[in-house]
Amino acid sequence: MQVADKTVVIAGLGVSGTSLAEVLRERGAHVIGVDERKPEADLRSFDDVDWDHVDYVMSSPVFNPRTPFVLEAQRRGIPVMSEVEFAWQLRVNNERTGTPAPWIGITGTNGKTSTTEMTSEMLTACGLDAPTAGNIASGDMSMSLSRCATNPQHDVLCVELSSFQLHFTDSLALDCAAITNIADDHLDWHGGRENYAADKSKVFHNAKHAIVYNAQDAKVSELAAEAQTAEGCRKVGFTLEAPQAGQIGIEDGWIVDRSGVAGGAVGEPVRLAAITDFTHLAEPDGSLYPHLVADALTALALVLGLGADRDTALKALTSFKPGGHRIETVAEAVVEGGSVRFVDDSKATNGHAARASLSSFPAKSVIWIAGGLAKGSRFEDLVKDQAHTIKAAVIIGKDQQPMIEAFASQAPDIPVTIIDPEDNDTVMDRAVEACGTYAAAGDIVLMAPACASMDQFKSYADRGNRFAAAAKTWSEVHGLH
């Protein structure tokens, strides 16, 4: 892609927009940054853009496809692209191979980040410079996707891709790609369920070596079956059950591959590792977190699909530690008869992720902190499905009504405490105190809110950090010493 002397409008000067602006300027482009909140922006309003002289637009995920400036650019025939599309078209040759570094792309409603991190860790253990990039939150502009794509030292890029980014991306031809799952999320942004799925499916288009899909998700399986990939590209389904031919899964306590990606013939069972080796994906009693096991299977299939050394990759995967705010025990209070454990899963920002989190625990053992910015979601199905696990619920957030209504209609016998949303600074302290009134030995206080965090917190990480602090304080005050 030649951008010298081209005029590019950057819509939104967050980390990715600012980084891309720098990359484009270094290549001789004339960049116009538009952001009403950033003093360094060239313009504060799209009304001030001289569209007659614009060649390209980079749109931030904050702007949906029906935003007026997007429609105006498209009306004029100006390409509207994501940072991902720009990065793909600007990528440079690796200094050792003389060709662009392979990209492994991971998308899905949930599980993207853990899968991307596992993939990177295994490839790094194999001696490759394989950073994570893309939708993974980072304030480091040197590791933005546009910077990584134009760095000749990287051997592989492990790219987390959101549906927002994929909407304005059209030319990707990934080396390996995965869709972890698809559930209703961001439907208002995309304009419906089918549009959302169609944007997710772009990771499979023209993939070269392997596409990895959730064989237990009917929609993802459909997208994989329909995917138009390069000749010879392997399609690998992952399952938490015994795998069929073409799949990788769990059989008799072992990770077993029947897809051929681990070196055997398609349909031939190849035992890779005992599931008991993955203690980091399990409860203290050894019971596995199903969604983290699914992420591990996905990542393993991706790196083997790229041709990584199997034994080295498996060794790295068995020592992988999930990142913060993902089903992480942050405090434990000794009480009469046992203990109460506090688990932070703040990254569970939608109902699908919260369901996976809740389903990891025994019946009637969870005091659930739920709520936040619902984004138009309804929770009746979630509450009905997980009522057997929930002992009590504590509802936070400014958008509480959807969660309140779900409990009233689907689980009226479960006690619910509603936290006054007025004081953001103390909301988590009050929520944890309320949980303490329900908790007894053997219980789990689980913060997996099923909602976004921006109504009362800076981010899901801020929400998780405040929960951890409140949990530790409660444990010190109320625990037996």
Curated annotation (Swiss-Prot):
It catalyses: UDP-N-acetyl-alpha-D-muramoyl-L-alanine + D-glutamate + ATP = UDP-N-acetyl-alpha-D-muramoyl-L-alanyl-D-glutamate + ADP + phosphate + H(+). Pfam families: Mur_ligase_C (PF02875), Mur_ligase_M (PF08245). Keywords: ATP-binding, Cell cycle, Cell division, Cell shape, Cell wall biogenesis/degradation, Cytoplasm, Ligase, Nucleotide-binding, Peptidoglycan synthesis. Pathway: Cell wall biogenesis; peptidoglycan biosynthesis. The keyword Cytoplasm applies. Its main location: cytoplasm. ATP binds at G108, T109, N110, G111, K112, T113, S114. Cell wall formation. Catalyzes the addition of glutamate to the nucleotide precursor UDP-N-acetylmuramoyl-L-alanine (UMA). Belongs to the MurCDEF family. PANTHER family: UDP-N-ACETYLMURAMOYLALANINE--D-GLUTAMATE LIGASE. This is UDP-N-acetylmuramoylalanine--D-glutamate ligase.
